[in-house]
């Protein structure tokens, strides 16, 4: 699976894989599918753009 082709602000299901339960972007070193720096930079931009458009939450409610 080629992630650069799939990483887009409209592809919310792929972006949710790289966000933890609090809505934060998971660091590059902790991602399960290892992303390159360029791919992670594209991921960050796409997540931020999806947040601005209301497709992803900025922060979810705390469970505690």
Swiss-Prot record:
One CC-aspect GO term: chloroplast
Signal sequence coordinates: none
Compartment annotation: Plastid, Chloroplast
Spans traversing the lipid bilayer: none
GO molecular function: small ribosomal subunit rRNA binding; structural constituent of ribosome
Family: Belongs to the bacterial ribosomal protein bS18 family.
One BP annotation, GO: translation
Record InterPro entries: Ribosomal_bS18, Ribosomal_bS18_sf
Keywords: Chloroplast, Plastid, Ribonucleoprotein, Ribosomal protein, RNA-binding, rRNA-binding
Predominant location category: plastid
Source organism: Euglena gracilis
Name of the protein in question: Small ribosomal subunit protein bS18c
Subunit structure: Part of the 30S ribosomal subunit.
NCBIfam families: S18 (TIGR00165)
């Amino acid at each position: 699976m080629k992630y650069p082709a799939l990483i887009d602000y409209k592809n919310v299901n792929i972006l949710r894989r790289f966000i933890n339960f609090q809505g934060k972007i998971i660091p590059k070193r902790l991602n399960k599918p290892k992303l390159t720096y360029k791919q992670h930079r594209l991921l960050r931009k796409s997540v931020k753009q999806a947040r601005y458009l209301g497709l992803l939450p900025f922060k979810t409610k705390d469970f505690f």
